[in-house]
Amino acid sequence: MEEALSVFEALSNRPKAPEYPIVILHSNKSKIVSLGCFQVADEDFLTSYLRKKGLKYFFRLHGGDVMLHDENQVGIALITPRDEKYSETYFSLVNSLMKRNSVPNFHVTNDLILCSNKLLGEVMHLENDSSSSWFALIYLKRNYEEMAGLKFPKEQLVKERISMLKENYIGLDQVLEKQVSADVFLESAKTVLTDDLNFKINAFRLGLGEKKLFWRNRNMLRRNIISEAVQLKHSAVLREEGAILLSKRLINGFLRMRVKIKDKTLERISISGSFMFEPSEKLGDFEKMLEGKELDETLLVEKVTEFFINEKVKASFAAFEIVELLCGAAGGPNERGNQ
């Protein structure tokens, strides 16, 4: 995963303390977006909990606290190619939605999140004169009280975190000061996208067959069994003559390297997967250091693996190129802009 997800935290000036630990999440640059929970205590503890609950697919990003959900909450997300020209669409959408619901004040932050929920509901392909992107309404199906019943040594810490979050985080229902159903919120979002932002919408509802395909593809990614079509979809490097693809599982997660080698010299390399660095430039500097050197495949893999181990990066299972899979599962076109 090359860029962090963003968190839109819906806040308003209310005298009453918030009751639900819920945020609206979005991604204004990355292709990957979801809703879920922050790190609860430490990575091993959280990973163990998620796997015991059967939640094998989640994004591990660093930092944060646990973020579990009231099952009636609704979130929104915008999925676009990594391009600056798309960044305003999300903010325009949120602004319009809040104004339509008479919410005077809200705040945008750029925190990081670890995600654990399944993706359900509507997926729409949006087009106007200047851009083409994907929009998703995401439903929350987690209940924060589950954590309180855990029989782990760190149970008390978990309870304390939950208590703190219930005092400090605010839900969409609280912002709008009314209950929000998924269907009503989706229709409101569609109205804003078409009437206010002048988008043409192609809507797709994921049926049972499409959802099975989507989750089967995610399972293939988890097992490092990726079809050639998926491997080639988002790589400009692979469209160049002489480019080869190396795929490798690293630690407990997934690492993928795209490389171009000519005359035994590494001309270009792009490393991606289910991991995050801080600062974010660290991985880019490492890639630049490798380029221009004579490296065979074995030595290159060794150097990259050594780098990750030295940086103490623990990658977790995550859906890689999730939007491409989502678009395919939803029956939408595979071409998105110039990517």
PLM regions: where:
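N-terminal lobe of the biotin/lipoate ligase/transferase fold
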Residues: M1-K85
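Residues forming anionic-ligand binding surfaces in small-molecule and nucleic-acid pockets
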Residues: L61-P81, K154-V175
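Contiguous, small/hydrophobic- and glycine-enriched helical/loop subdomains that border
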Residues: E71-L112
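Flexible, glycine/charged-enriched surface loops at secondary-structure junctions
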Residues: S102-T109, D196-K212, E297-V301, V313-F317, ...
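A contiguous pocket-lining binding segment that forms or flanks enzyme active sites
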Residues: H107-P153
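A conserved active-site cap/scaffold subdomain adjacent to cofactor or substrate pockets
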Residues: I162-R205, W215-N224, A229
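Structured beta-strand/loop patches that form or line metal/cofactor-binding pockets in enzymes
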Residues: E210-T265
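Active-site- and interface-proximal helix/loop "cap" or "latch" segments in soluble metabolic
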Residues: K260-R336
